[in-house]
């Protein structure tokens, strides 16, 4: 398994305030790493360090030459008076060819949105368009900052399934910031709990029993994490979710529970 980015003892200061301290991690192809932590923990700052938007105050970053990164921001802020269709929005990405747009939207089951105004999209539709845009350059690393913010629970299930499928197809690394403990954990390979420093890291099973994780999210959060992961691995392997969140069994029948 090849390592795409390595952070070693990275720290970030904003003036006199230390936002990140002694961060070391590896992003590897085919792996999903999920960042968890309270508000103000430095999660978005760490994402910007990985994207190369913030220079660390100390420590080192090593990355593969020519690394292609796709980024899905937490939220897109558009001028409501600016007429902008999904197609025109996708064309704003440098180097994009018109013929690349529809296949990317089809990949995330959003081709029907091609001529829709960006401002009229629902939360789930907007996130799928942002994901399609991030896939235009066939990224080796996909970075998602709270990808399901503003999306209902059913839409969240569908988005996480989709991200997992993309990881498998592209064999890309995925770095994801999330608060959705019980939803995201069924798909992630590694969890990193952040609160300016790395409190704990490892598989969901390991992290869910760690004292610092329990201190951060409480016993209920830890139980939720461990139980969901166990149930999903052992009892929910015979289905996936469509983009409306409906459960689809492997024989393509809908489950109407």
From Swiss-Prot:
ATP binds at residues 37-44. This is Zinc import ATP-binding protein ZnuC. Its main location: membrane. It comes from Photorhabdus laumondii subsp. laumondii (strain DSM 15139 / CIP 105565 / TT01). CDD domains: ABC_Metallic_Cations. NCBIfam families: PRK09544.1. The complex is composed of two ATP-binding proteins (ZnuC), two transmembrane proteins (ZnuB) and a solute-binding protein (ZnuA). One of its GO terms (biological process) is response to zinc ion. GO terms for molecular function: ABC-type zinc transporter activity; ATP binding; ATP hydrolysis activity. Keywords: ATP-binding, Cell inner membrane, Cell membrane, Ion transport, Membrane, Nucleotide-binding, Translocase, Transport, Zinc, Zinc transport. Part of the ABC transporter complex ZnuABC involved in zinc import. Responsible for energy coupling to the transport system. PROSITE patterns: ABC_TRANSPORTER_1 (PS00211), ABC_TRANSPORTER_2 (PS50893), ZNUC (PS51298). Its EC number is 7.2.2.20. SMART domains: AAA. It is found in: Cell inner membrane.
